[in-house]
């Protein structure tokens, strides 16, 4: 992600008026660290199964699976542990809901928090059974509209 953030910084600074706050609250950093410790176990194995263009060929699926299992373990085992991860995520999503200050931006103003957190939440929409708190669901939906990025609810497994 560091390279992606470098691109975000460059575009924000060089094209038009700067709009992103660089502030990331410590509570958001802590939330990302906690959820980041396990969310790949929920999402990664599903990516090859939800019809994404990057996985149209078996060779792409095989390569991705080989590389990612080195980090998260067997895909089938991760899928089998979904309920365990969902139980953990439920509390973490409730913590995030308490930190959301606006449906259009976590801190009330578009910031790096949104650039970092929205992709995590978007990826979680590929997991069937997640109960997003209303504030989190509103945020995900609004950010998807603002960024013109589709969510995976209709493909969730």
Annotate each predicted stretch with a short phrase.
Residues 1-63:
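GST-like domain detector, emphasizing the conserved glutathione-binding G-site
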Residues 130, 138-157:
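Alpha-helical oligomerization segments
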Residues 35-141:
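GST-like fold's C-terminal all-alpha helical module
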